[in-house]
Amino acid sequence: MCMKASERFRRPFRRLRDFLRSLDMRRNIGIDLGTVNALVWAEGRGIVLQEPSVVAVDTVTDRIIAVGRQAQEMIGRAPAGVETVHPLEDGVIAQYDVALKMLQHFIRRACGHMLLPPRVMVCVPSGIKDIEEHAMVEAAREAGAGRVYLMEEPVAAAIGAGIDITAPVGRMVVDIGGGTTDIVVLSMGGVVVSESIRVAGNRLDEAIARYVRKEYGVLIGVRTAQTIKMRIGALYSHRQVRSVEVRGRSAESGLPVVITLSSREMLEAMAEPVSTILDAICSVIERTPPELLGDIMAYGMVLTGGNSLIYGFDHLIHKVTGVPVRVAEDPLTCVVKGTGMALRNYRQLSEGAIHLTKERRDRL
């Protein structure tokens, strides 16, 4: 009798608890906090922010002057006492305080005024270290997040590219971002084989700048190199040779000069970092179980990330590996779209895909 009375007493409270859970007013926010660009997804609104991961700081007062696109426009043009900072390097936080301010800015813009702090999922490279993971979680919490989840970038990219990662089928994704290249083989909601290398868009830009200095004796900035890469970058023979005029400074005289670069030069210019990326892809393929490799040959490898748009990258990878390759639709946004889809279905995904802080794992 006592047990039945106790159960009758508890039942209304359980119903109230379930009702309150159904009225959870936390907003889901997905963040692709990249080395070069940051994208933010908000539930019910889609992608609400896509800006450079740059912050302008007053070096005297440490005050944040501008964030995102406004800060990027100051690069190379800022007056004395103002420094433009990329708070992330190779996909992880390099300058904590600046990264915190940037996250606060992005979360406020995405959420506005809220009754409860948002549930936030941040994407991180596959090979992130414990201390780097901790820094990202703490920065998100201090920036105003309630519950914090971390998700590996290539897993989010796979989901955002429309791949059903819960299926008992091997799928392979290569996410070529700004700071890292993340390669993963997925099956049944978990990661089977993965590798993350800190060679990606930034290293390609640096390689182009080195090439221009070596071959032409001209100094250019990384932003100029990035523009060259996206305009005429090519890793496979192009039917029409493209060219671009580049303005720089003579390393010998220090005077302004103008040179013309051709798309045919890009493979040589980017050869070293591209070779490193290809080696990493081959390494993952070699470590993939034969059964899953058969699936990958059937379904193909999917490329995501902004640098997958470089002309001929997919053809080059196919030529080297023998695996069919395709570039995802809208590869720039796959990661952040994947975070949104994962937040809506996080209970169905294994911990191989979503990492939670320990104190929050018990609350789910």
Regions found by a protein language model. Give the residues of each.
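Acidic, divalent-metal-coordinating active-site segment for phosphoryl/phosphodiester hydrolysis
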Residues: G179
